A protein has these predicted regions:
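Membrane-interfacial loop-to-helix junctions in multi-pass transporters
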Residues: 7-12, 63-69, 95-108, 137-144, ...
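Hydrophobic alpha-helical transmembrane segments of multi-pass integral membrane proteins
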Residues: 72-75, 97-129, 322-361, 374, ...
């Protein structure tokens, strides 16, 4: 009994830090401050003093990844604000109305489309489009938030441009096709779960989706013109990422995303000359932009404090004995995914341990099934994470209560995890 309690100690510490963060969010302390408080509590519980906490936080804010993410989110907000202010988002929705006649399809279409663009914080890109698609409907903000958040991530276990997939195949020394040939069920599972929990009749009543008469014309040229900035962002980012990976692998892929987003902003301003340079000055002085930046600061501080305090290593150390394989394939990926809120974190932190255990047990022939199980478990943790940047930014955009919105994710995430276990048992 005593040894069990000792093994649970690091997990209970992490749980306490999360409870503290959620309490701060609940009592309107603010997202950024709540996450910083959680990082400080975690630092103290894992042996870091206030000076070490500050040093870890300072290191986080000079990393390339932080600078790139801040630039990406900033450009996304500028682009979405420009399209909204110029009325282009509304015109785009009107031009697509003849193609997207189902209100439910309209709500999920743009998050799913933007999900093909593997960029951090991408849910804030599609959030204004969901808001525009929902105009005239009587849908609660938290419902729009979960629809945007969930359908933005339906491709992450299948789309080969996502960094989590790329890192997994690099660590396991396998081909991408060997992995996604078994992880692809994650996409239809998320589609079905998203429809059942967020979109089906009974969850969203038909009367809530009632709208005025939709245009019956289908103008491909109008849709192309109004959607050109999005095409520049998506196709440009994917193309530049591919070019960088093929010809300049030493250059961070985020630079391709930044260039594509900057070009899409230029595209909007050329198409809508009335915006002018005054628009840029106005958007850069908006409080909402800098609130988002502060949240990103807090998330990066939390991530680096977690690394500096050796949180993952401590959890892995106590998960030994007969529980090691289960812990490394399910529990640790889930927990690290939930703590960090990004795929690369659970892959990089726990997959080397999992691969090492499989090797030590002579189970290399079971590598793919266990990687699939760990991927489903880790991604479930990422999706349920209250500090997932897409979740936080989406809730911030729709101005909805984070706790109440988070509770709506428990059901579909449980279904997703159980489905992943089912896929694993099928493979073994």
């Amino acid at each position: 009994m005593e040894s069990l309690i000792i093994k649970l100690v690091p997990f209970l510490k992490v749980l306490f830090a999360f409870v503290l963060m959620l309490a701060g969010m609940r009592f309107k302390v603010g997202l950024g401050l709540s996450i910083l408080a959680g990082s400080l509590a975690m630092a103290f519980m894992f042996g870091l003093g206030p000076i070490q906490w500050a040093e870890a936080g300072a290191v986080a804010l000079i990393q390339d990844k932080f600078i790139y993410l801040t630039a990406i989110v900033g450009l996304i907000l500028i682009l979405s604000d420009a399209m909204e202010r110029a009325g282009q988002s509304k015109r785009l929705m009107e031009s697509l109305s003849g193609f997207l006649t189902s209100p439910r399809l309209r709500l999920m279409f743009f998050p799913a489309l933007i999900g093909l663009l593997p960029m951090p914080g991408g849910a804030v890109f599609s959030a204004p489009m969901v808001k525009t698609a929902a105009e005239g409907m009587t849908i609660k903000n938290r419902d729009m938030a979960v629809i945007n958040y969930w359908f933005r991530h339906i491709w992450e276990l299948f789309w080969p441009l996502y960094p989590g997939i790329i890192l997994t195949v690099a660590l396991a020394d396998i081909q991408i096709i060997d992995l996604i040939a078994y992880t692809w069920p994650g996409t239809p599972i998320m589609l079905v779960a998203g429809w059942f929990f967020f979109l089906r009749p009974g969850v969203l009543d038909t009367k809530d989706l009632a709208m005025g008469p939709l245009p019956t014309t289908r103008s491909k040229s109008a849709a192309f013109k109004e959607g050109l900035p999005l095409l520049v962002a998506i196709v440009g980012a994917i193309g530049l990422e591919g070019a960088i990976a093929a010809f300049m692998p030493s250059i961070p892929f985020e630079l391709g995303v930044i260039v594509a987003l900057a070009l899409s902003v230029v595209c909007v301003m050329v198409q809508n000359t009335q915006l002018g340079l005054k628009f840029l000055k106005d958007v850069l002085s908006k409080k909402s932009l800098w609130s988002m930046v502060f949240v990103i600061v807090a998330i990066f501080v939390f991530k680096d404090v977690m690394l500096a305090a050796g949180v993952v290593e401590e959890m892995a150390r106590v998960a030994g004995g007969g529980a090691a394989l289960f812990a490394s394939a399910v529990f640790l990926p889930f927990l690290v995914g939930m703590v960090a809120g990004i795929n690369v974190a659970f892959v990089g932190a726990t997959f080397p341990l999992l691969l090492g255990i499989l090797s030590s047990l002579g189970m290399q022939d079971q590598t793919i099934p266990y990687l699939v199980l760990a991927t489903f478990a880790g991604f479930t943790g990422v999706m349920i994470s209250p500090i997932h940047i897409c979740f936080i930014l989406t809730c911030q955009y729709f101005n909805c209560d984070l706790g109440r919105t988070w509770r709506k994710l428990v059901g579909p995430c449980l279904v997703f995890l159980l489905s992943g276990i089912g896929v694993f048992w099928f493979l073994v």
